[in-house]
């Protein structure tokens, strides 16, 4: 199954320009079977899909609930929790990465750095946490090894780190506007219909 694993919606991200229904339409046209909604410190994009679209349209397309969390010491992280888990703390930005990791794993979820070697103040690879102890990468479950918004050199650096620390590799567009949607993907060998399915495959 082909998923875009980094998507920002108008309903959930202040800088998102595309409504989630339009997102789904574009991805379906491009041959995708699913997406991870990963708005900034918010589940509102996913909530809109759940409350207004789910079960009524696009029933052959999988929408997974995620979040791009802004830590106070290690950049941005993609987080996926099992369905039904609702920790409000993830919509309050600013936890240190150590606490975020403990919280996510305590709830049975997974996390990994978004654009890990990208823009300086948003990326784990630029943080003092990583520079002082690169092996901290082993505490995560995956790494965004390809991000459409980053230059090839940065993506290659991410792929190298993922393979060094034996982390699952995600590809995502990190799209905020229509022309970026579907410019990256992650291929899953087994069917994914829920967040728990995804977590099981990554672990």
Q: PLM ranges: what are they?
A:
Residues 37, 108-119:
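Substrate-recognition element of Asp-dependent hydrolases with the DxDx(T/V) motif
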Residues 37-40, 113, 145-148:
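Conserved beta-strand positions
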Residues 39, 67, 115, 173:
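Glycine-rich, histidine-containing beta strand-loop boundary motifs that form or position
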Residues 92-94:
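Caspase-like (clan CD) cysteine peptidase catalytic core
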